[in-house]
Amino acid sequence: MRTIYLSLLVFIIVLALNEVMAKKHSSTPKLRRSDFPEDFIFGAATSAYQVEGAAHEDGRGPSIWDTFSEKYPEKIKDGSNGSIASDSYHLYKEDVGLLHQIGFDAYRFSISWSRILPRENLKGGINQAGIDYYNNLINELLSKGIKPFATIFHWDTPQSLEDAYGGFLGAEIVNDFRDYADICFKNFGDRVKHWMTLNEPLTVVQQGYVAGVMAPGRCSKFTNPNCTAGNGATEPYIVGHNLILAHGEAVKVYREKYKASQKGQVGIALNAGWNLPYSESAEDRLAAARAMAFTFDYFMEPLVTGKYPIDMVNYVKGGRLPTFTAKQSKMLKGSYDFIGRNYYSSSYAKDVPCSSENVTLFSDPCASVTGEREGVPIGPKAASDWLLIYPKGIRDLLLYAKYKFKDPVMYITENGRDEASTGKIDLKDSERIDYYAQHLKMVQDAISIGANVKGFFAWSLLDNFEWATGYAVRFGLVYVDFNGGRKRYPKKSAKWFKKLLNEKKKN
């Protein structure tokens, strides 16, 4: 009970700070590079399946996203796939040149698991062409003075492991992921000093195993009749458990074998929106706290305490929530050097009666999460229906993590908004500039209060394959002409970042 009250107290403190800080800002903040700490890192981010292409080249094996998008095009909004994507596999030097031209300090990219290990696991052999590609990318970045931030897993589980034992549904994946991470550390760790084990494990769990709208597309039939298999009441928790253990094992390998010589840092990139109470009632405040427990805290709490959030323990009925052994708990506690925060949008949370039928991870918190209150959206909508713009949420999440989870070192590892694809080359993205200005100001506010934020990565450097939305929306600072040889055109927002970042060099 004490833990529940502590969580609610932290939540209320952040809400109170929100009210105080809300009075400080006008609509569009003016930013300077000097508003941020001298060592603050600015970068841009991508992921392997979304930008690389070359899906069937140089020995790469298929991932679950190749299968999901190529075999079932009806599951993608525009029927497309990432087989060519932004073609960064062939155009990586041009992309590094764009990063350098804009003035970014760092580049966050992910490594394609099946490009390194195309045949199940380590026993199937390492694909040297994959090693060579990432060595070339890393070396090109360093030659331009750009720090590589590498993500080991960004949703693209090898299809061979999905076939062998169900991917992250199988306990075997923990050791296979550990071995894959070991290969990455061994081959790239002499130059890569910032690692993220996983990107958004929450999205993997929610969209891949509850909603069924992302690979591998599993869910309960009552949630999505297009799912051919799955169980939204049990599978998400099994997958989440294995993701957490895989992270822990990878960090353990790094610390035991590589940290002393390579002197790098290992973290994880976690996503969550901020959840505001739907009303001022105590019930809705508790519902908002539960919504946080089942999203950000779900993956953060085990890394701090070695346990699941108490709200999850209390609300996931019927023995569906796995438990950590004493040995696993010890391994997980403190298994991060920094926490990546991916933020796009926020929601309201309203207390609702707990369901005893058609139960899933979504219903377990007994909280209805919605982007509207009394018919009014929490903020303006971007191109995607889920992306309602609420800049204060990024500050509130940073402060929440600071006060609840021992003041961790944090990076904003993704932040951005999209516009709809029109078929025309449109480089005037003033709405994106406003989005970044608003959110960066909120990050600066959080730092001024004491949040230990060390950097910010824009999503994304390039227009790319946006998962179930395909190419119907664009998140890039750089326009990619998918009908014209993947030619790149910097948008107005890229020039805005260049002006912001070049101030440092002038001074």
UniProtKB/Swiss-Prot annotation:
Residues 1-22 form the signal peptide. Disulfide bonds join C219-C227. Keywords: Disulfide bond, Glycoprotein, Glycosidase, Hydrolase, Signal. GO terms for biological process: carbohydrate metabolic process. It is an enzyme of class 3 (hydrolase). The active site is at E200 (proton donor), E414 (nucleophile). It catalyses: Hydrolysis of terminal, non-reducing beta-D-glucosyl residues with release of beta-D-glucose. Glycans are attached at N81, N226, N358. Its EC number is 3.2.1.21. PROSITE patterns: GLYCOSYL_HYDROL_F1_2. One of its GO terms (molecular function) is beta-glucosidase activity. GO terms for cellular component: Golgi apparatus. It comes from the Eukaryota. Gene3D superfamilies: Glycosidases. A beta-D-glucoside binds at Q50, H154, N199, E200, Y344, E414, W459, E466, W467, F475. The keyword Disulfide bond applies. Belongs to the glycosyl hydrolase 1 family. This is Beta-glucosidase 12. It comes from Arabidopsis thaliana (Mouse-ear cress). The gene is BGLU12.
